[in-house]
Amino acid sequence: MKQTFRFIKPIERITHLKPNATMMLFLASVLAVIMANSSLSTIYHEILEYPINLTIGGHEVFSHHGETMTLLQFVNDVLMVIFFLAVGLEIKQEILVGELSSFKKAMLPIVGAIGGMIVPVLFFLLVVHEGPGARGAAIPMSTDIAFALAALAVLGSRVPASLKVFLTALAVADDIGGIIVIALFYSSHINIGMLAIAFGILFIMYLMGRMHVSNLGLYFVCTFFVWLFFLQSGIHTTIAGVLAAFMIPARPGLHAKNLRAEMRSLFEAMPNDKIRQSGSSLILSHNQINVINSMRKIARKAISPMQLMEEYLSPIVGYFVLPLFAFANAGITLGGVTADALWGVPMAVFLGLFVGKPLGIYFFTYGFVKMRLCPWPEGMSRLNLMAVSLFGGIGFTVSLFIATLSYAGAEHLLFLNEAKLGIFVASIFAALVGIVTLRYELNLESAKAQKS
């Protein structure tokens, strides 16, 4: 009985977590599955087919191959650009000052990410190596960092910080690989003229950064036009979000070291005017308001446009874009999957994510360390490396996205449905086995510490 309670403790920890973006993403996915497999399925598909219109000067902005975008296309081709803009900002931060900022720091996560991209593809192709189903070989390449870190958080503060750092850096390197795959293999009929205009706008954004332009509105407007011309160029629009992110300056208008002195001088300049007060109501003088507004502007200058944009985008992506993406794309029709079909695309995706991804990350990382090409990360053992590698098999968001690109069109709907099933099952297995493995390792370490 005691063992049973010990086993369900992580589940209890999940149920006591306050609602967050990851939980909303999970709930949106569950809602999509319920609606797609109930009497609400007609309503669900009608929602996804709802047309999205925006006409400016006679030009229909949200147009997909000359036709008005449906809600599903709008989510995948427009809203996901915002997600990849946020991903690009995160990648840029890691390259500038994070775990990818030096060759020595970046080497091991990059090697692990490479293994975690190559081996899953091989496992997929072992099962489905020809025909239209093989188009989805890239599906098990990706890690969902939000769900992976949420699974890690289930075990609380006992998890070594080095594991979180390694998993985050691994996922960022993984994102870079996924972006390259999307750019190379999911673009068609490239319009060089439109692409040249898009890169011209990106160059203007670069010059704006060099000229210390910090107005986020201008960068958002430029990003919109970069997206618009990428949409017409034939290269997938998510690449526009990533490239635009790299153009956002990371240099603030005021160095943090000078912020305290600036604030002190403004604080000392605060007029000692009489404050009118009645109960909890309080009215400042105009001079006091001016000084406080100056403080606000100075404080804002101390934050770079890159970090400001990330702060703005984070809640939008977490609480709106990703849950809506999950709702639009996670609707698996379980009734349409036969027993024979399970051995095709679903098994290929499952083996790629749950077996290939962890093995690729683990053996590439461990092999690199054994060859003395890179030091073993502090606080990491072989067993918790395997646990982190299993968390890498939680694909979900980006895997679903690549599945929609791989099996686009009505003729591939069955493959898309099967791929979604494989992603769901593999991600759940990877999370559960990863949690159990890491919990076992942490308990072993705790027992050893108590004996000593």
Swiss-Prot record:
GO terms for cellular component: plasma membrane. InterPro entries: Na/H_antiporter_dom_sf, NhaA. It catalyses: Na(+)(in) + 2 H(+)(out) = Na(+)(out) + 2 H(+)(in). Its main location: membrane. Keywords: Antiport, Cell inner membrane, Cell membrane, Ion transport, Membrane, Sodium, Sodium transport, Transmembrane, Transmembrane helix, Transport. It comes from the Bacteria. The chain crosses the membrane at residues 23-43, 71-91, 108-128, 136-156, 165-185, 189-209, 216-236, 316-336, 349-369, 385-405, 418-438. One of its GO terms (biological process) is regulation of pH. It is a multi-pass membrane protein. One of its GO terms (molecular function) is sodium:proton antiporter activity. It is found in: Cell inner membrane. Disulfide bonds: none annotated. Na(+)/H(+) antiporter that extrudes sodium in exchange for external protons. Belongs to the NhaA Na(+)/H(+) (TC 2.A.33) antiporter family. This is Na(+)/H(+) antiporter NhaA. The lineage of its organism: Bacteria, Pseudomonadati, Bacteroidota, Bacteroidia, Bacteroidales.
